[in-house]
Amino acid sequence: MLKIRLFCAAGMSTSLLVRKMIEAAEAEGTEVDIIAYPVNEFDQHLAGIDCALLGPQVGYMKAQMQAKAQAAGVPCDVIPMTDYGMVNGKNVLAFAKKLIG
């Protein structure tokens, strides 16, 4: 099971994207645990996950969050703006899987 966490300004704007990612995972038979949180809770939700994704609106924090994630052995990157804006769960799931390796 892939444990993916999305972090944005308040944790609310990514809720629809989370649903679309879960639907995409179910369609391809991938087991996932995907939850969105506000970025100020990043440290509390880093342990035991496979990937951390940042919403574009907090992309300015990328270097800081990647440093924390790297220390925990977790890949972290900013969700591409187009996929985020279009709520393309399939593409964002593929992006996360590529980060995980």
What are these regions, as identified by a protein language model?
Residues 2-39:
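Conserved active-site segments centered on acidic
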Residues 3, 75-101:
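Ser/Thr/Gly-rich flexible loops in soluble cytosolic domains mediating phosphotransfer, phosphorylation
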Residues 15-19, 59-66:
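Short, surface-exposed alpha-helical segments at coil->helix boundaries
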Residues 19, 23, 67, 94, ...:
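Short, well-ordered alpha-helices that flank and scaffold nucleotide-derived cofactor binding pockets
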Residues 38-44, 61:
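Short acidic active-site motifs
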Residues 46-51:
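Short acidic/histidine-rich motifs immediately flanking catalytic phosphotransfer sites
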Residues 56:
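Glycine-rich, N-terminal phosphate-binding loop of Rossmann-like dinucleotide-binding domains
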Residues 61-81:
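A short, gly/pro- and small-residue-rich
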